[in-house]
Design a protein with these regions (language model features):
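Active-site-proximal cap/loop segments of hydrolase catalytic domains
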Residues: 1-105
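C-terminal, loop-rich substrate-recognition/catalytic regions characterized by aromatic stacking residues
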Residues: 72-204
């Protein structure tokens, strides 16, 4: 870490106090690579700013064209997960604060998030796993009922909530950039790299 990385785009912690006190509308997703930074900003902005703040968290991949997709990777979240009115929301936001027109865009709680799950354990006609989910509104972040849990990788390759004994021998592997371990799913930028890998949820 040196001067090259010391900028607002790469290190929000050092520059969070430099943000102007203006209305902020944030849009991110569970499979977008900015979700951690965006929710961290939400927490810190609420401590510092008096202007209105709103956030929407969906299921799409990183990229505007995926906002109308009901799936990410090989998982389908249903038609209800699609954010149809994003342009309408943006126009309402700008009209509210640039034209001083009351658009009701500030009505409702701070956060609107898509809670993934509650779907069936089968696949649809396109072969996507039906995972389902629903939209939830919240005035607080993290949302009420959130439980933070630490998971640890054990010798058998499984995750466990019990921290391994420090006396256990570590698991080691050799990293060879000429023969890398394949990447499948998750938060990838851009979501489709030359048709080689795709972001989202996959059965691995």
């Amino acid at each position: 870490y040196d001067e090259f990385w010391k900028n607002p785009g790469a290190n929000i912690e050092e520059y969070i106090d430099d943000y102007p006190d203006i209305p902020i509308f944030m849009l991110t997703s569970w499979y977008g690579h900015h979700v951690w930074a965006t929710t961290t900003k939400l927490i810190e902005f609420k401590k510092r700013l008096k202007s209105p703040i709103k956030i929407i968290i969906g299921t799409w991949l990183h990229g505007y064209e995926t906002l109308l997709d009901p799936y990410s990777g090989e998982v389908s979240f249903g038609q209800n997960s699609i954010l149809h009115n994003i342009e309408d929301l943006r126009l309402k936001w700008f009209d509210q604060f640039l034209k001083e027109i009351d658009t009701n865009v500030l009505d409702g709680p701070i956060a609107k998030i898509f809670v993934m799950g509650t779907g069936e354990t089968k696949r649809d006609v396109n072969g996507s796993l039906i995972h389902g989910g629903y939209w939830r509104n919240s005035e607080v972040w993290p949302i009420e009922g959130t439980n933070f849990e630490s998971y640890y990788l054990n010798l058998n390759g499984l995750l466990n909530t019990i921290k391994p004994d420090s006396l256990e021998p570590p698991t080691q592997f050799t990293f060879d950039p000429n023969n890398p371990v394949p990447t499948l799913g998750g938060c990838i930028q851009p979501p489709k790299v030359g048709g080689i890998v795709s972001g989202g949820a996959f059965d691995q």
